[in-house]
Structure formats: C-alpha cells, structure tokens
Amino acid sequence: MTTQPHAEPPDRAHAQATGPADQLQDRHRDHARATPIQQPLLFVGGGNMAGAILRGGLAAGVIDASRVFVVEPDTAKHADLNQLGVRISASATDGVTWINSVDEVAGGQGQRDAANRAQVVLCVKPQMLPQAAADIRAAFASPRVVISILAGTPSSVVRRSLGEHARVVRAMPNLAASISQGVTAICLGDGASRDDDAVAHAIFRAVGPMVMRLEESKFDAFTAMAGSGPAYLFYLAQGMIEGGVRAGLSHEESNRATRQSLLGAAMLLSRSDQAPESLRAAVTSKGGTTAAAVGVLDQREALRAIADAIVAGAARGEELAKLASK
C-alpha cells in the first residue's frame, strides 16, 4: 500500500526567515509541548541510527525510556545505550518476552488494535534480516506494526520474513538524524493500513525537521539522493581541504575554513528561496577567482558527475531490492 507524496518542512514564510540553527531552536521549543508516544517500542538493533533515533526521541519528549526495550547482540554497544535509561539485552528472546508482556498488560490483541499495541523498530543491517526475523518472529503471532529502516529492503521482504501479521512501515532517515537535522522518507508498506505510520512519523519528526511521505517505488531514488547525500558533501569537503593545502594553506587552516564555508553555504541555501544556480551566480563575478574555479568544475562536468552518481546509487538500490526479494 502506498501514499501520496507529502513533505512537512517548516512553512515557506518561516523557512525564508530562518536557517537550520533557528529551525533547531524552534524544534527544541516544540519539544516542551511534545506528547510521548503511547505505544511501547522494541528496537531490534542498537547501532548508530538506533541510538540517534532514541536520543532524538528522548530529547523531544516523544519517546519514554521506560517504555523502550533494545535488543543488541553486541554487548560493547550496551554502555552507551544504558546511559539512555532503556532496557537492553543481547537476547532477542528477552525482547519478545518483554513485548508480549506489555501487550498483555495493555490488552487488545485484535487486528483493529495493531496500531495501538507495542511496535517493533527494525534497525539491523539488511544482510542480518533473516536471522533477526527468525529471532523475533514469535512477536508477530498477532498483528503488529514494524518500522523498518533497512536500506534496499522492500517492505514485502520484511513482511515475508516476519509473517503475515507484520504491518510494515518503511522509513529511510539519513545521517543528520544523529544531530536532529535529518530528512526521512516514510511509507505505508506491505500489510500496513491508514494511520499505521503515526508512530513512525512522530519518531522521525523528532530527529529532523522534514519527514516526507513517499510511494515505496521512490525509496531507491530518495536513498541515493538524501540517504547518501551527506557522503557527497563530505566528498566535496575532502576535495576542498586538499585544494586549500595545495593553494598554500596549512591542513588545519584549510580544514577549519572548509567546514565553516560549507555550513554557511548550507544555511544560506536553507534561508533562501532562490535556486542553487542563482545563489552560485550571485557570488561568481565575471573574470574573478570564483569564475576561474567554477570553470574547472564545468570543464570536468562536475554537475553531471554528481547527478550520474545519484542515478547510479538509485540503480544499485533497485538491484539490491531485487536480490532481497528472491
């Protein structure tokens, strides 16, 4: 099942007047009014993204630590998770026992109550899905919503792995969620029905100012563009630092200047209604230093290379999805 595209960024007038730092402050003010999610949450996987989601949700007041259980086989990760005040175990059996016990306390085992029962947040690596699904399948003896952030893994594959009672909401956050500046795509996936994504929307709204509801058919494109987007910027930063050193700066000087330049440019782009090419033209004087630099980028077809990279990433995502579906 799919939904129509829908984005929920700050409103246009507000976006013109404020930048990322201001938006972050506005979201912190909203945190004070946040209503905690009522459904208990079982996180399967306690890696970097799970930690980012938990930290953002806890800071926003959306997630209640006392209603969270994390299954993470790698005990080396437990120390960081313990600081969040959530229950943790290396055993999936413990997680299944916990989620079934909170269901018994809350009551409501029927299909119509699935959206209000404890939900599973699946945060393992895609190649770990078969084992993870086998470990928690007992939690899906009756209808339950599962939020999957597995890259390149269609919701139909997740449901097939967990059983017919799994109601899959697919989500794809990006790395900036770790500093509450992420952009996340979500969709109602296989077996899910209207309102099953309410908890997912609340969670990911807590770790970024934008949550986009997309058709699942667009997830590979979104992953290649926004999910992998931070990597492209880091790649650019790497080149800028190297160029600064070759031009005469020390590595420290070039590193510091690059980081602040990219941050400032991102904030300008966020605050402006102008297209990126218009902003670029505004700082590119004919015959000047920027024109000389951009000329080299144009000669090397840098714009085309970036666009081709995103298309290649999306194509790879489609390939991985086909492999996962076999």
Model-found features: residue ranges?
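NAD(P)+-binding Rossmann beta1-loop-alpha1 motif at the extreme N-terminus of oxidoreductases
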Residues: T2-A115, Q119, G182, V245-A247
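Internal alpha-helical scaffold of NAD(P)-dependent oxidoreductase catalytic cores
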Residues: V157-R167, V183-A221, Y232-R271, R316
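NAD(P)-dependent Rossmann-like dehydrogenase/reductase catalytic/cofactor-binding core
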Residues: T2, H6, R27, R259-K326
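Short pre-catalytic strand/loop immediately N-terminal to key active-site residues, enriched for Gly-Thr
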Residues: K218-A224, P276-A281
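Short acidic capping loops at alpha-helix termini that bridge into adjacent secondary structure
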Residues: D64-V68, S142-R144, E252
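Rossmann-like NAD(P)(H) cofactor-binding subdomain of soluble oxidoreductases
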Residues: T75, L81-L84, S91-I186, D190
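Acidic, glycine/proline-rich low-complexity segments that act as flexible tails and inter-domain linkers
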Residues: P40, R55, A59, A198, ...
